[in-house]
Structures are given as structure tokens and as C-alpha cells.
Curated annotation (Swiss-Prot):
Organism encoding this protein: Saccharomyces cerevisiae (strain ATCC 204508 / S288c) (Baker's yeast)
Gene that encodes it: VPS41
Keyword Transferase part of the UniProt annotation: no
Record's protein name: Vacuolar protein sorting-associated protein 41
UniProt main location, coarse: other
Oligomer and partners: Component of the HOPS complex which is composed of PEP5, VPS16, PEP3, VPS33, VPS39 and VPS41. HOPS associates with phosphoinositides and the PX domain of VAM7. Interacts with VAM7 and VPS39.
Positions where Phosphoserine occurs in the chain: 26, 53
This protein's GO CC annotations: endosome; fungal-type vacuole membrane; HOPS complex; late endosome
Length: 992
């Protein structure tokens, strides 16, 4: 197999350099044997595990484990200073809100874990954790930090750890890579690369592929696998190229060290002096290169190898990289599914190894023929965002809601800005890149926004011996236990668990600081309803003690209502206790004079004891706050307060108060008390008690109640008050109102009287109007009586038709004649007398005279009073009396208008015309008499001619029909006789 021409030794047969750990757990190096070679030690867990107790919160911890929360955290164990503890307590008491994170020292590890050696690398996998030390020892533990085994892997510091779940791999400064099995401690293999290894990654299915990727100080990204003969084949994926050094700009064959190698599917990304490089393995094409910024915090020419890059895979296609003070977010566009791998530092995920297929992906790399036919990459890498943070990053992990948790060392931005200004002014400042290692500074944890780097939260963490540590001595890892993520802050000789505060932690934090309301709010999710209520009660009682009535009013109902809603329906005793406490606090507020503020918050359901509601209403009534009194007797159910007591009190106040005018609206007057009393009576359906007050208050609701409840018979003595309810003026002015106004204003009372016609007779109502009502009520009586007209009950007013005629003659003359024509149960003579006494009732008199046969009197009235010839003629025609014609002619001969009207009447016989003409006096002046007579003659001639023609027609038709009749009579008839008829005739003749 051939590789790049510039590196002819990139493919090596390393079989001679590969060392296998035998069953005696010793390492044999055939090429480089150290005189002080150490055997690989596998320590039993029982030898390195100290006594461990289970904490109450479910996290395994030692009895001396310390928990630290706050913004300035001291996580050191052992000799804690009492004064420092007191200061911390005071600082925490000053805080209003709990910290976002809590810190717990991890003490499950062996006692000598940090004492004899210091940690150089970490791995937090899904099923186990691994810790490498500077002496080359690898500690494997469970996710609860219970030791699994300890292995002596290397002769010097372990710089990286990786796993595929079944196998683990470590890389060391000593230039070796150790790969071992988690199941078989004796199955350990060593690979010697002769140069320090900074990063190593196993294939996701290493057991089958035996493939891994590594890189280090040699500057090569090496893919190692076994060929078909079983020999190890190393393939350098990055070409060796000339580079310019920063000192002399001279070309050099030296490549910068590989600081980290990570893979996503069949993509590999690595970090070196050239920055961040993404490479597609099948095509060996570089997809993207992002140079490492040469300036960090005003320090020029910063070497990338001073800082370890830290990579975290957010999703299968998104990766975030933190390096120095820079953070990049990349997105990879995949065209097919593939498993991800990654390797390197403490935040690497164990199961993200590249999904290489040894027979396809790598085959293209091994075949020289295939290498000349490299395809086009089927994926791309995009930089989504890039920003810098004010810290040197030594670890990062995803947090919640598109946030990043970053471990590092803070940089004073103000100081750096000052330096920038001084540099602009020409002042000479020199900072060496090595100073950025921040040795002796305490590390910080920051939560920043993933897309813009905005700082959200900041904590400084004081770890053991931090004064002696630098940036590369810290590690940050993440592990998700079921659903709760945990973060681990590891230094060379200390380990701290970092967790987001749970609801229970928040609850305890608030309780310690007596912030009962906040504890009560969170308690909904962490404690029972009864215990939570006791905390809420503590908060309310504390407000009572402080006399903070405003806050008490604001929170009172919130606590009690939520408590009642959360209680079980069977918790009767607890519910009653809650209601009792609720009532007690409300009564305290009432006593303190905060009734107006607390009244709207007093619950209607569930109901408290009656005394609470009574106290509020008594207060409003005693202080003449009638509007408030009305508001709450309207809002509250009658069962909540002592209704009868308030009814009695209002009755007493009404009796004691002076009777105000109808227009009085002042609170405290008896009309206001009466309104509230009526309201209570009506809510209790005590209508008989409410109506007298409604009548006095002239409240129209009385009409509705009397109508619906059919109570009018009980209040006949107050019929005048009932009728006058809708009327606001003086009684004497009623007579001045028109019938229309009467019907409009008194519509409801009249309807009420009419609807009770079957229970209260018309006679009774008429009697009341005649004897008990003012004379001005006659119009109302008239409107009441005519209400019966055109109804099925019109017979009820038959006895009062004479009275109606008189009322019609006074108030509605236009309707009198139709009434006379339609009804017959009145005394005609009395009606004639009434109509005769009233001027202008001529039509009515004419009708009445005609009704009794006095047609001549009626006709005389028409002629003398109405002077209406046409009406007189129509009157005579309707009666059809010839004598009446004679009377009209004789009575009208001296009246030209009437004479002319009779002569122009075209439907009468000529005899009338002759009588009129003959009876006319010679001096009678009639307009157009000649034309009238001429017209009469023409009409008569025409009539005669028409009659003659009709006679001829009739005679002709008569003759025709007579001749036909005679002809028919003179003709014989033909009869058909059957044989049966002949036989019958013969028999009859024989008999005869």
C-alpha cells in the first residue's frame, strides 16, 4: 500500500512495536525497555473503596462530604474555618434568590486517589468513569464513583482516555496507546508510537474493526487498524506540509502537535497549529478550516498548543468547540445516518466513534488505485456562530435552554481595555503568551448563551491547592443519570460534583432563610399539602407580626385557595382547620381596620364562619357605607351571613329615620336603608314583606312581583299606590294627560288590573275607582274598561256600557260611534241623553234616533244640524221608506242644496223628480237648474228607450220559446216494447 509521497513512512508495519499484556499483567517492550519498568497493576475494588454511606438525597456520598452553594464557593474539606463559615452564612442570608448551582465534594474515591498522585485526564462515559493520573495509572469507577479496577497503563502522564463502551483506550506522554477490555482485565494491548500521544479515539465497534485514531506531538493524525494478515497498519490522514514559523518566517517541515481528535460519522476534526480542520475520510478532502486566533486578550502570537481544545457534541450533527477564549458552533449536513465518535478530554462522550466500515471506508485509503479516484464529499460543515468569552476555557458542556456551562479562568475585561487604550497611546506593554496559563487563579464556572456568548451566571469555585494549578490542570465532565444531568469539576487533586439546584434544594434554601412564601411556592412540588400549608401559615403569621397588612392581603387568598384545591376530598378535618385559620386571619385584618381591603378577598365558596361576614357587613352599615353594604349582600349568598339580624336592624333604622323626600339619595336615609331591606327580602322570597317598602319607594319592581306572584288581591287597599307607581307628577295633573299619555304611563298598572280580572271583579275595581280614587283617575278607569274590548271577556263590561258611553263622550268621541254600533247592552235613551248634552255628537244621535225608529228626527238632525244632503239621501236610501222620502222632499223644498242633491240623484224614479219640481217655489234659487232638468230629461229618454228595446228582446225570445213549446206538444212519441212486456200485457188482459 502507498500513501502520500511526502511521507513514505506513514504506513508502517508496527507488529514489532506492538506489545501485548500477558496474563501476568506485565508490560514487555521489545524496542524500548526501561530499566525501571513497572508492571501493570490491577487493583481489586475491595482494596481501594472506603466506607460509603447513602445520603438522604439519593446520591452516594461519604459522611464527611461537604456541600457548597453560592457565588464564592469554598469546596475544601478537612479543616474548615468557623469564621469563614459564619461569613458565608451572612453572605447567603443577604441573597434574595438561591444560586443556580450547588457543589458537592466527591469523596467516594479511594483515600489515596489524590494524595499519592494527581489526575491528568478524565472520561465520563454512560456506564463508567475513568481517571488517568500523571504516574500513568488508570482508575475505572462506576457512575457512582465506586471503584471497578485500577490499572498501571503507562510510565508517565495519561493525556487522554476514550471508550466504545466495551473497550477503553488511553494515550500518554510516553508515546504509547493502551487498549483494554472492560470485561477481561487481562485483555490489554499496548501500541508504541514513539512520540507523546495527546488524543486517541476507538472505533465504535472496536471489537470487530480493531481500528482507532490517534495523534500527538508528532503532528500526525494516524488511523490504525489491522490488515488481513493481522498486522497493524498506520495511515496518516493529514498531509505533511511546509509551515512558516512565527519567529523567522522560514519554511519548516515541523508540524504542530495534534491537540485533539474527534470524529462525527466518517468526518474527522482535529485541532493543531492550523486551527480547526474538518476532513472527510472516504475522499480525504478537507471540508473546512478555521484558523486559531493569534491574539487572545491583547496577547499576540499565542501558540495554540498552550491550551487544550474542548469539544462537546450537542447533537449528532452539531458540535461546539471551546479553545482558548473562543467558542465555535458547527453544523454538519449529513446525507445518511452514521454513528458518531469522539475522543479526547474529560467531556468526551464514549460512544461517538466514527462509523468506519473497514471494507469500504478504509479500503479506499489502503488501495493506491482507489486513491486516484477519490470522490466528492457528500456532506458539508457550516460555522453557525463564533464568539469569545471573557475567560480562558478549560472545559465546557451543554446546559439547558441553548446554554453552555464553561469552566475556565476569568479575564478582567476592564484591565484589558485599559491596556488597549494605552497601546493606542504608544505605551509599551508586553505580555508573554505563557502568562495566559493563569496559574494560581481560582477557576470559575460560567453559564453563557450558546449563540452570542452573553453571560447568564457566574460562580467562582475554590478547589484544593488551586494556587499551584494552571489552566490545563482542570477538567469538566457531564453525565446524565436517568433524567438529571450532573457535572463534574476535576482538578489534579480534587473532585467536585456540580448540580443544578433541584426544587427540594430551592425549598430548603428558602426555609433556612425564613423566606416562607418562596418556600411555600416551591413546596407544591416537593412536600405534602398539609406541610406546605403550615409553611404558608408561617408566612402569613410573620406578616401579622410585622403588621404588613398590604402584603398579607395580597397573599392571603393565594395560599388558602391553593391549599384547599390541593387537599383530598376525604380530608375533612384538615379542610376545616384550614378554613378556621383562614377566618382567624381575616378577623385579625378586620380588627386592624383593613376591612375595605380584605372584604373583596373573603371567599364565597368554601364558606367561612358567619361571624366573618357579619363583622364586615356590620362595619359597613355602622359607618354608613351603604354602597359597600349593598355590594356584598348582593355578592354573598344569604347563607353566609345572618340575614334576619340585618333585616331587623334595617327595619329599626327605617323607623328611626325621618321620612325623606322622594328625591333624596343621601346614604343613611331611610330610603337607602329601605332599598337594602327590599333587596334582602327579595333574595329570601319574602315578597309580602318587600311590597310595602317597594310601594313606598315607588319601585316598579312591585308591579312585576305582584303580577308574577299574583298578590294583587292582598293589596286592594293600596290600589291607588300601585296604580301611581309609574307616575312621578302630581295627582291633580293626571286629568290633564291625554288618553295616549295615560295608556303609556299607566300601562303596567292597567295591565295588572286587567290580568287579575278573574280574581278581582270589574265591579270591585269600578267601585274602588268611584269611591276610593281621586276624580282624576276617571281616565285611568276608562283605559281599564276599554282594555276588555275586542277580547273574549268583553262581556265583563256589559253592565258598564252606559258608563263607557259617558266616558267615551268625554275622552274619546271618535270611538263613541263605533262603540254604539258594535254594542247593544246600553240604554239608548240614556245614550241619547248623553249625546244630546254634548255638542257635536250628531252622528251618534242620528244613529241612536234611527236605532229606535225615530227616523224623521234623525233625518231632521241631518238636515238641520249637519246640513249634509248626501248623508240625508243615504240615510233615506238605507231605510227604504217611501214616507221618509216624502218627508225629506217636503222638508227640503226650501233648501236649495238639498233640492239640487235630490234632483241629481240618478238612481231614483222620475216620480221623485216630478214631486220635487212641482213642489219647488218659484222664487227658489238653484244653481244650474236648467242643466239639471235637461240631464233628467235625457236620462229619462234614455231609460225609456232602453226599456223599449229590452221589451222587444223579451217579446222575441218569448215567441221563440212559445213556438218551440207548441211544436213539441203537437208531436207524437215512439215507444219500444219488449216481448216480456207483451206477455205481461196478455196476462193482464186475460185476468181482466
Amino acid at each position: 500500500m502507498t500513501t502520500d509521497n511526502h511521507q513514505n513512512d506513514s504506513v508502517l508495519d508496527q507488529q514489532s512495536g506492538e506489545r501485548t499484556i500477558d496474563e501476568s499483567n506485565s508490560i514487555s517492550d521489545e524496542n524500548n525497555v526501561d530499566n525501571k519498568r513497572e508492571d501493570v497493576n490491577v487493583t481489586s475494588p475491595t482494596k481501594s473503596v472506603s466506607c460509603i454511606s447513602q445520603a438522604e438525597n439519593g446520591v452516594a456520598s461519604r459522611t464527611d462530604e461537604s456541600t457548597i452553594t453560592g457565588s464564592a464557593t469554598d469546596a475544601e474539606t478537612g479543616d474548615d474555618d468557623d469564621d469563614d463559615d459564619d461569613d458565608d452564612d451572612e453572605d447567603e442570608d443577604d441573597e434574595d434568590e438561591p444560586p443556580l448551582l450547588k457543589y458537592t465534594r466527591i469523596s467516594q474515591l479511594p483515600k489515596n486517589f489524590f494524595q499519592r498522585d494527581s489526575i491528568s485526564s478524565c472520561l465520563f462515559g454512560d456506564t463508567f468513569f475513568a481517571f488517568g493520573t500523571h504516574s500513568g495509572i488508570l482508575h475505572l469507577t462506576t457512575c457512582a464513583f465506586e471503584p471497578i479496577k485500577t490499572i498501571k497503563c503507562h510510565r508517565s502522564s495519561i493525556l487522554c482516555i476514550n471508550t466504545d463502551g466495551k473497550y477503553f483506550a488511553t494515550g500518554s506522554i510516553d508515546g504509547t496507546v493502551i487498549i483494554g477490555s472492560m470485561d477481561d482485565p487481562q485483555n490489554i494491548t499496548q501500541y508504541d508510537f514513539k512520540r507523546p500521544i495527546n488524543s486517541v479515539a476507538l472505533h465504535s465497534n472496536f471489537q470487530a474493526s480493531r481500528m482507532f485514531v490517534s495523534g500527538g506531538m508528532a503532528g500526525d493524525v494516524v488511523l490504525s487498524q489491522r490488515n488481513w494478515l493481522g498486522n497493524r497498519i498506520d495511515i496518516v490522514l493529514n498531509k505533511k506540509k511546509k509551515k512558516k514559523t512565527r519567529k523567522d518566517d522560514l519554511s519548516s517541515d515541523m508540524k504542530g502537535p495534534i491537540m485533539g481528535i474527534y470524529t462525527m460519522g466518517d468526518l474527522i476534526l482535529w485541532m493543531d497549529d492550523d486551527g480547526i480542520t474538518f476532513c472527510d475520510v472516504p475522499t480525504r478532502s478537507q471540508l473546512l478550516n478555521i484558523p486559531f486566533p493569534s491574539r487572545i486578550f491583547n496577547v499576540q502570537d499565542v501558540r495554540p498548543d498552550l491550551f487544550r481544545p474542548h469539544v462537546h457534541f450537542l447533537e449528532s450533527d452539531r458540535v461546539v468547540i471551546g479553545w482558548g477564549s473562543n467558542i465555535w458552533l458547527f453544523k454538519v449536513s449529513f446525507t445518511k445516518d452514521s454513528n458518531s465518535i469522539k475522543s479526547g478530554d474529560s467531556n468526551s462522550q464514549s460512544n461517538n466513534m466514527s462509523h468506519f466500515n473497514p471494507t469500504t471506508n478504509i479500503g479506499s485509503l489502503l488501495s493506491s488505485a482507489a486513491s486516484s479516484f477519490r470522490g466528492t464529499p457528500d456532506k458539508k460543515v457550516e460555522l453557525e456562530c463564533h464568539f469569545t468569552v471573557s475567560m480562558l476555557i478549560t472545559g465546557l458542556a451543554s446546559f439547558k435552554d441553548d446554554q453552555l456551562l464553561c469552566l475556565g479562568f476569568d479575564i478582567d475585561i476592564e484591565e484589558e481595555a485599559t491596556i488597549d487604550e494605552d497601546m493606542k497611546e504608544g505605551k509599551n506593554f508586553s505580555k508573554r503568551p505563557e502568562n495566559l496559563l493563569a496559574k494560581g487563579n481560582a477557576p470559575e464556572l460560567k453559564i453563557v448563551d450558546l449563540f452570542n456568548g452573553d453571560e447568564i451566571y457566574n460562580d467562582e469555585v475554590i478547589m484544593k491547592n488551586y494556587e499551584k494549578l494552571s489552566i490545563n490542570d482542570y477538567h469538566l465532565g457531564k453525565h446524565i443519570d436517568k433524567t438529571t444531568p450532573e457535572y463534574y469539576l476535576i482538578s489534579s487533586n480534587d473532585a467536585i460534583r456540580v448540580q443544578e439546584l433541584s426544587l427540594k434544594d430551592h425549598f430548603d434554601w428558602f426555609m433556612e432563610r425564613k423566606q416562607y412564601y418562596k418556600a411555600w411556592k416551591i413546596g407544591k412540588y416537593v412536600i405534602g399539602s398539609e406541610e406546605r400549608f403550615s409553611i404558608g401559615l408561617k408566612f402569613l403569621n410573620s406578616l401579622v407580626t410585622k403588621k404588613d397588612w398590604g402584603t398579607l392581603v395580597d397573599h392571603l387568598n393565594i395560599i388558602f385557595e391553593e391549599t384547599l384545591n390541593s387537599l383530598d376530598s376525604n380530608s375533612y378535618d384538615v379542610t376545616q382547620n384550614v378554613l378556621k385559620e383562614w377566618a382567624d386571619i381575616i378577623e385579625i385584618l378586620i380588627t386592624s381596620g383593613n376591612i375595605v381591603e380584605i372584604a373583596p378577598l373573603i371567599p364565597k365558596k368554601p364558606a367561612l364562619r358567619k361571624s366573618v361576614y357579619d363583622d364586615v357587613l356590620h362595619y359597613f352599615l355602622a359607618n354608613d357605607m351603604i354602597n359597600k353594604f349593598h355590594e356584598y349582600i348582593t355578592k354573598w349568598d344569604l347563607k353566609l351571613f345572618s340575614v334576619e339580624d340585618f333585616e331587623e336592624e334595617l327595619e329599626t333604622r327605617i323607623e328611626a329615620a325621618s321620612e325623606p323626600t322622594a328625591s333624596s339619595k343621601e346614604e343613611g336615609s331611610n330610603i337607602t336603608y329601605r332599598t337594602e331591606l327590599v333587596h334582602l327580602y327579595l333574595k329570601e322570597n319574602k315578597y309580602t314583606k318587600a311590597i310595602p317598602h317597594l310601594l313606598k319607594a315607588k319601585d316598579l319592581r312591585a308591579l312585576t312581583i305582584i303580577k308574577i306572584q299574583n298578590l294583587l288581591p292582598q293589596y286592594l287597599d293600596q290600589i291607588v299606590d300601585i296604580i301611581l307607581l309609574p307616575y312621578k307628577g302630581e295627582i291633580s295633573h293626571i286629568s290633564k294627560l291625554s288618553i295616549f299619555e295615560i295608556q303609556t304611563i299607566f300601562n303596567k298598572p292597567i295591565d295588572l288590573l286587567f290580568e287579575n280580572r278573574h280574581t278581582i271583579s270589574v265591579a270591585r275595581i269600578y267601585e274602588i275607582f268611584e269611591h276610593d280614587c281621586p276624580k282624576s283617575f276617571k281616565k285611568i278607569l276608562f283605559c281599564y274598561l276599554i282594555k276588555f274590548l275586542d277580547t273574549d271577556d268583553s262581556f265583563m263590561i256589559s253592565p258598564y256600557e252606559n258608563q263607557l258611553i259617558e266616558l267615551y263622550s268625554e275622552y274619546d268621541r271618535q270611538s263613541l260611534l263605533p262603540f254604539l254600533q258594535k254594542h247593544n247592552n246600553y240604554n239608548v235613551e240614556s245614550a241619547i241623553e248623553v249625546c244630546s248634552s254634548k255638542l257635536g255628537l250628531y252622528n251618534e244621535l242620528i244613529y241612536l234616533w234611527g236605532k229606535i225608529g225615530e227616523t224623521k228626527k234623525a233625518l231632521s238632525l241631518i238636515i238641520d244640524e249637519l246640513k249634509n244632503p248626501q248623508l240625508a239621501i243615504d240615510f233615506v236610501k238605507n231605510w227604504g221608506d217611501s214616507e221618509l222620502w216624502e218627508f225629506m222632499i217636503n222638508y227640503s223644498l226650501d233648501k236649495p242644496n238639498f233640492t239640487k242633491a235630490i234632483l241629481t240623484c240618478s238612481d231614483e224614479t222620475s216620480e221623485i223628480y216630478l214631486k220635487v219640481i212641482r213642489g219647488m217655489s218659484d222664487d227658489l234659487q238653484i244653481d244650474n237648474l236648467q242643466d239639471i232638468i235637461k240631464h233628467i230629461v235625457q236620462e229619462n229618454s234614455l231609460s225609456l228607450e232602453v226599456r223599449d228595446n229590452i221589451l222587444v228582446i223579451i217579446n222575441d225570445e218569448t215567441k221563440k220559446f212559445a213556438n218551440e213549446f207548441l211544436k213539441i206538444r203537437s208531436q207524437g212519441k215512439l215507444f219500444q216494447v219488449d216481448e216480456s212486456d207483451i206477455e205481461i200485457n196478455d196476462d193482464l188482459n186475460g185476468v181482466l
